[in-house]
Regions:
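Histidine-centered copper-binding motifs that mark active-site loops
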Residues: 17, 27-300, 321, 331-380, ...
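Short acidic, glycine-rich loop/turn motifs
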Residues: 254, 265, 315-319, 454, ...
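Active-site pocket scaffolds in enzymes
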Residues: 123-125, 131-136, 140, 272-283, ...
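Extended, hydrophobic interaction surfaces within ordered domains
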Residues: 6-8, 320-330
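Short, surface-exposed ligand- or partner-binding patches at beta-edge/loop junctions that are enriched
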Residues: 160-163, 306-319, 508-521
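N-terminal export signals
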Residues: 7-27
Length: 534
């Protein structure tokens, strides 16, 4: 069956739908420009429009407790500003679409691939059977389909998300906009009904002035791509109007490839009530919160009682070991959401249950493992890894391609893309990812303790598929081990340069599970490995 790729219309930045209906374009063979193109800056997109809820994926099932739909990744024309449209890759023509289900439901999704390359559908943060994980070795070819079906078991409540995970194609697909939110509601919600909830998917884009997604640069591959256009639910710095004293629940996903979010809310304290795996035991008051790529945060804020005031939720500069030419936005405060209090009566404060949840600490481990994250730069010296440790070749080399019995190997980078990839290996335990390589073997149901060491000069967010973990202790460079301040179920956690984390986890489902840096470009250049669970 020949693939047909449809270029459809949707919206970005809250702009109204434009044009005369459906456009059909053959995009096969289109290449990005050889010379650097002029880029669209953040000011080109209108800001301050009312915050829009995430567009929903419609449930096609009339059966209680079952969610069935079809997700179609394809190219779409998206109005960006007056007279300019961008070509993005989206699920069902929607920017950051939402699937909402409940614990105990069956999720039944058919993926119809209308891209011109392989893709997968990875359910980030959801404990699923290995065959449903959307791993690189389960790629869906262009024009083909794949069925994902699993039960959302007890304990799966939380804000998760889905995104592509093909071998050597993830960075390009994420850069084109492919991502969505998966909200799993608990069977019993312990938060008061007076709390006003908003889901916020933070993403970024880099577009040329002609509306094309700009190609990756060498700096993108080295550091993780940060697009100049910072978006919340597909909008630039939207506005949220609330009554004074409103208690807001802001549930955030950092869906960026490489951008860190150092969140502060002007004149307000943030209260953390949940992380990747759902609610924590007790609220944690914070002045600011760092959210790395792939992480989620569940925040409560009681807005000022003063009417007709504005407060900015913004991401502040964060130093994460940037290499090469430094973009100006790294040193700038980036507004995400403007909260405005209305001229209205004051909403009363709400009382939270105490505790919010119960998290049982994992017991003594049956196995302990050492995990080292490092970079090897042959032309510029070694950034942490041991040079005589065998590894699988330099970033972008053919050594990362082999599938060796695991299905086809995914999307291969273009010649242009390969040309700008730096000659650097991002490694786990001295090895770059290969499809046929299994680093660890373990047993289902056993408590594992991993000491993860970031032996490099830059931050790396560490993500584990197939389970959640507890951060037991941390050890910064030149310091002693410190117990973690609170327990949480996590699937992604940051490691600062030369920091160590002690994680405990239990794999329930057998199979091959990935763990990797969630800076997408680092993952694609080799900082990914596999554990096989029997």
């Amino acid at each position: 069956m020949k693939r047909r790729e449809f270029l459809r219309y949707t919206t970005l930045g809250g702009l109204a739908l434009s044009g005369s209906g459906l456009l059909v374009h053959a995009l096969a063979g289109r290449h990005s420009q050889t010379l650097p193109a002029a880029l669209l800056d953040n000011a080109s997109i209108p800001a301050g429009q009312p915050l829009q809820p995430l567009p929903r994926i419609v449930n096609l099932s009339d059966q209680v407790g079952r969610f069935h739909s079809v997700l179609t990744p394809a190219a779409h024309a998206v109005p960006v500003s007056d007279g300019l449209e961008a070509t993005l890759w989206l699920y069902n023509g929607k920017v950051a679409p939402l699937i909402e289900v409940r614990e105990g439901d069956e999720l039944d999704i058919t993926l119809m691939n209308e891209l011109d390359q392989d893709t997968t559908l990875h359910w980030h943060g959801v404990p699923v059977p290995q065959a449903q994980d959307g791993a690189p070795w389960d790629a869906v070819a262009s024009g083909e389909s794949r069925h994902y079906r699993y039960i959302l078991h007890r304990g799966s409540a939380g804000l998760h998300w889905f995104h592509p995970h093909p071998h050597e194609g993830t960075a390009r697909q994420v850069a084109h906009g492919l991502a969505g939110a998966l909200l799993v509601r608990p069977r019993l919600d312990v938060l008061p009904v007076e709390v006003e909830e908003h889901l916020l998917v933070v993403s970024d884009l880099r577009l040329t002035t002609e509306g094309e997604v700009a190609s990756h640069t060498a700096e993108d591959w080295m550091n993780g791509r940060e697009g100049e256009l910072l978006l919340v639910n597909g909008q630039r710095a939207p506005r949220l109007d609330v009554a004074p004293g409103t208690t807001l629940r802001l549930r955030l996903i950092n869906a960026c490839a490489g951008r860190y979010l150092r969140l502060r809310l002007e004149d307000h304290e943030l209260t953390l009530i949940g992380t990747d795996g759902g609610l924590i035991e007790r609220p944690q008051p914070l002045k600011e919160l760092l959210i790395t790529p792939g992480e989620r945060a569940d925040l409560l804020v009681r807005v000022s009682e003063k009417p007709e005031r504005s407060f900015e939720l913004a991401s502040h500069p964060y130093t994460r070991g940037w290499m090469g030419a430094k973009p100006t936005h790294l040193d700038e405060i980036a507004p995400l959401l403007s909260i405005h209090t209305l001229n209205a009566g004051v909403s009363p404060a709400v009382k939270l249950p105490n505790p919010l949840s119960h998290i049982e600490p994992l017991g003594e481990p049956a196995v302990r493992r050492q995990v080292e994250l490092a970079e090897v730069m042959p032309d510029h010296g070694d950034h942490g890894a041991v040079n005589d440790t065998p590894h699988a070749g330099h970033g972008g080399s053919d050594s990362h391609h082999g599938s060796h019995g695991r299905g086809h190997g995914g999307s291969h980078p273009s010649d242009e893309d390969r040309a700008v990839r730096p000659k650097v290996d991002f490694l786990i335990n001295g090895r770059a990812f290969a499809m046929n390589d299994v680093l660890f073997e373990g047993q289902a149901g056993e408590v594992e303790e991993w000491d993860v060491f970031n032996n490099s000069h830059m931050d790396h967010p560490f993500h584990v598929h197939g389970t959640h973990f507890q951060v037991i202790a941390t050890r910064d460079a030149d310091s002693e081990w410190q117990d973690a301040p609170w327990l949480a179920w996590k699937d992604t956690v940051n490691l600062a340069p030369y920091q160590r984390l002690r994680l405990r986890m239990v794999f329930i489902e057998p199979g091959d599970w990935l763990f990797h840096c969630h800076i997408i470009e680092h993952e694609e250049l080799g900082m990914m490995a596999t554990i096989r669970i029997s």
